[in-house]
Amino acid sequence: MKKKMSKLNARVHDFSMFKGNHIPRSKIHIPHKTIRAFNVGEIIPIYQTPVYPGEHIKMDLTSLYRPSTFIVPPMDDLIVDTYAFAVPWRIVWKDLEKFFGENSDSWDVKNAPPVPDIVAPSGGWDYGTLADHFGITPKVPGIRVKSLRFRAYAKIINDWFRDQNLSSECALTLDSSNSQGSNGSNQVTDIQLGGKPYIANKYHDYFTSCLPAPQKGAPTTLNVGGMAPVTTKFRDVPNLSGTPLIFRDNKGRTIKTGQLGIGPVDAGFLVAQNTAQAANGERAIPSNLWADLSNATGISISDLRLAITYQHYKEMDARGGTRYVEFTLNHFGVHTADARLQRSEFLGGHSQSLLVQSVPQTSSTVEKMTPQGNLAAFSETMIQNNYLVNKTFTEHSYIIVLAVVRYKHTYQQGIEADWFRGQDKFDMYDPLLANISEQPVKNREIMVQGNSQDNEIFGFQEAWADLRFKPNSVAGVMRSSHPQSLDYWHFADHYAQLPKLSSEWLKEDYKNVDRTLALKASDNTPQLRVDFMFNTIAEKPMPLYSTPGLRRI
């Protein structure tokens, strides 16, 4: 009898449950080829696609990079970085839940806002803009498309590429308002409007990772105590010739003697005498105030320990970053998943140097008198990214794949810090001094000029970092300043004026590469031509074919 009752109870209907639907899925092969041309430093979207809840994506990428022909084989490397990200719609559009019917009131369902639009600028988007790279036909005015992909790109930049110490965030609208597109190159306002691509920052090295200050925030200070009495002392005037008081104007000039009378306000400064005589026995009080610290309260060991901890806290924030994902990692050693922090999610990536092939000349040239064996160069590099993406998605998102080409920088105008070290023994490294605060990097280390600016501070770096880093260098005729310079053999920096630690200086510079190419970006010829081939296997919550029929009315 008990067994029968238990079976009966097991079959009781639960009104709080909804069975839902079993959605069949289909495995679909989606190849995609795209050919692009761009310059060094530009972060280019090379692939974008929407994904839906329950969709699984496995993506491989094969790339063929062909830079412009080099004048000679360069002695530096161009490095390709490829990144794949997922950006949920909800983190770039706050009304997503309302769009799909979520209501904050009772049964009534209010009109849901549509996905926000962006309208092409006057004359349409230009060639080479983000809109162009995302697949929108350029130079067509009046185009009206949905804006979430541009917002997603801006979100990725803010989360992963922006230097938070020097650069402002890209503007990012989250509401349902429509926007007007742009062809501009402003790195703050024009990114979410489909303007020019964001320029990546240089790779981190001794100079590019410098901090604006030793700590993030005001330096922690130690107060001597609460209050101290101020004591005054008198000084006897020795004789009648003493002149303890002299009248001067606001520029330090002695005020003229004369008689003040009725006149205009701008008549000048006048007094009867320019000094005041003292009499015997009188006392003057010039610059006579100081604190008597014998009665001041001192700082306790607990307060000292707390102040040191505050300073450590601020130094950790400066060096490790203060995005929340960075804070939890630096302070607690916990790497929080991107999805938990409403961030764009990094799915995978790859980094590889481009190969350069030398081409020796086999016959002389009459016009330029170049001999046989004269070298030129070209690059044709195949890059294979297996499993660039392999993920199941649980919400509406965009997959966006980005590519950028950069190089490691060589410096030719500075002098290493150790050449100036040795004023005293505390200027030299000692294990006891290993963990002192961030130390200044002087201007002379990146560009020496032989003037007072050499000793000014360029930025701050961890103590003794110059002993752990050796900057790449050139010399002799390889220097860009040489009258017969051969700087087309390398990508070394050469500054016309003293660089400043700033967002503008931190951006990757395509011009160093331009001087090594036969066809230059300055002549409106993109430095790189790339053939991208995406091989995607998608398991989608949809049939393999959509066949219409009366049974599905």
UniProtKB/Swiss-Prot annotation:
Disulfide bonds: none
Database matches in Pfam families: Phage_F
InterPro entries to which the protein is assigned, alphabetical: Capsid/spike_ssDNA_virus, Microviridae_protein_F, Microviridae_protein_F_sf
Coiled coil segments of this chain: none
Regions that span the bilayer: none
GO cellular component, one term: T=1 icosahedral viral capsid
Highest taxon above the source species: Viruses
Compartments it resides in: Virion; Host cytoplasm
Gene3D superfamilies referenced in this protein's UniProt entry, alphabetically: Microviridae F protein
Principal place of residence: virion
Keywords linked to the UniProt accession: Capsid protein, Host cytoplasm, T=1 icosahedral capsid protein, Virion
SUPFAM superfamilies for the chain: ssDNA viruses
Gene Ontology terms, MF aspect: structural molecule activity
Chain's role: Assembles to form an icosahedral capsid with a T=1 symmetry.
Similarity comment: family membership: Belongs to the microviridae F protein family.
Protein name, per record: Capsid protein VP1
Organism for this UniProt entry: Spiroplasma virus 4
